Amino acid sequence: GIKVGVVDLVMFRPFPADLIGRVLQGRKGVVVLERTDQPLAVDLPLMREIRGTVSKCLENGRDAKRAIYPDLATYRELAEAPPLYSGSFGLGSRDLQPEGLIGAVENMLPEGKRKKLFYLSIDFLRDKAVTPKQEAYQQTIEDAYPEVRELAIKGSENPNLMPPGSITVRF
């Protein structure tokens, strides 16, 4: 099995950089999932804070005598800073499915695609267009943005986690 942990951030401000820096230290990979998208930003909001925290922890490791940011962890080597992956989900009110979480983890694995920025539970282009008009629209999009199909990540499976006999109703 794969050893996976979850940090559920319930409050964004003040940002718990002290705790995040310690939790992330030495991890093999960290995926940050955010229910937002900011296409022209360098990073999504939470990833920006986490990247800033990791950077400050690395700065602490530069000076062996004193930490520049005493409340934060000290990363003495670059290897103590985990690779960071940023995922966006829930766009267009789409539900995050188990398949998306599986895909986010599989992306970080050595045999995974290792995309640094990706989207879950959304297809920008359908594999097979429903109508000729949709096919023309999709071709126009793909011509203008050839990499758009690669932005979405899918997991290898989508297990049904509902209890036996239950149904899902969406309003």
Where on the chain are the PLM-derived regions?
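General small-molecule cofactor/ligand-binding pocket signal
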Residues: 5-7, 85
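Short acidic loop-to-helix transition motifs that present clustered carboxylates
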Residues: 9-17
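A short acidic (Asp/Glu
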Residues: 16-19, 41-43
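Catalytic phosphate/nucleotide-handling subdomain of diverse soluble enzymes
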Residues: 19-21, 25-28
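Peripheral docking tails and interdomain loops at the edges
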Residues: 33-158
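A short, charged/proline- and glycine-enriched loop
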Residues: 162-169
